[in-house]
C-alpha cells in the first residue's frame, strides 16, 4: 500500500531564507510594474521624455507665481 509520509531517511527540502524570499518578491513586483507601465506603448522612452517635459513645464508655472495684472485685455468692437 502507499505511504502518506516520506521515508524517515529523507530530510525536508531546504526553504529559502526570509530575506532572499523578500528580495525575490520585490524584484518580481518591480518587473511586473515595469511591464504594466509599458503595456501598449511602442516607444517607452519618448513617453517618458514627454512626461518629464510636462512635469518641468508645470513646475516652472507653479514657481513663477501669479501672472502680472493686466495680462489679458477684453475688447468689444
Swiss-Prot record:
Protein origin, superkingdom: Eukaryota
Keyword set, alphabetical order: Cell membrane, Endoplasmic reticulum, Golgi apparatus, Lipoprotein, Lysosome, Membrane, Myristate, Palmitate, Phosphoprotein
Bias-annotated ranges (Basic and acidic residues): 25-37
Membrane topology summary: Lipid-anchor; Peripheral membrane protein
Lipidated residues (S-palmitoyl cysteine): 4, 7
Lipid-acceptor residues (N-myristoyl glycine): 2
InterPro entries the UniProt entry points to: SVIP (IPR031632), SVIP_metazoa (IPR055366)
GO biological-process terms attached to the record: negative regulation of ERAD pathway; negative regulation of protein-containing complex assembly; negative regulation of retrograde protein transport, ER to cytosol; negative regulation of VCP-NPL4-UFD1 AAA ATPase complex assembly; positive regulation of autophagy; positive regulation of protein lipidation
Modified residues (Phosphoserine): 46
Biological role: Negative regulator of the ER-associated degradation pathway (ERAD) of misfolded proteins. It competes with AMFR/gp78 for binding VCP/p97, and inhibits AMFR/gp78-VCP/p97 complex formation that is required for degradation of ERAD substrates. Involved in the regulation of adrenal cortisol and dehydroepiandrosterone (DHEA) biosynthesis.
Subunit structure of this chain's protein: Interacts (via VIM motif) with VCP/p97. Forms a complex with VCP/p97 and DERL1.
UniProt-recorded name of the protein: Small VCP/p97-interacting protein
Species of provenance: Homo sapiens (Human)
Amino acid at each position: 500500500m502507499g505511504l502518506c509520509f516520506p521515508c524517515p531517511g529523507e530530510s525536508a527540502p531546504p526553504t529559502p531564507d526570509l530575506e532572499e524570499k523578500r528580495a525575490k518578491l520585490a524584484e518580481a513586483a518591480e518587473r511586473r510594474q515595469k511591464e504594466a507601465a509599458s503595456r501598449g506603448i511602442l516607444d517607452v522612452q519618448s513617453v517618458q521624455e514627454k512626461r518629464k517635459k510636462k512635469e518641468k513645464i508645470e513646475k516652472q508655472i507653479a514657481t513663477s507665481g501669479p501672472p502680472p495684472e493686466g495680462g489679458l485685455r477684453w475688447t468689444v468692437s
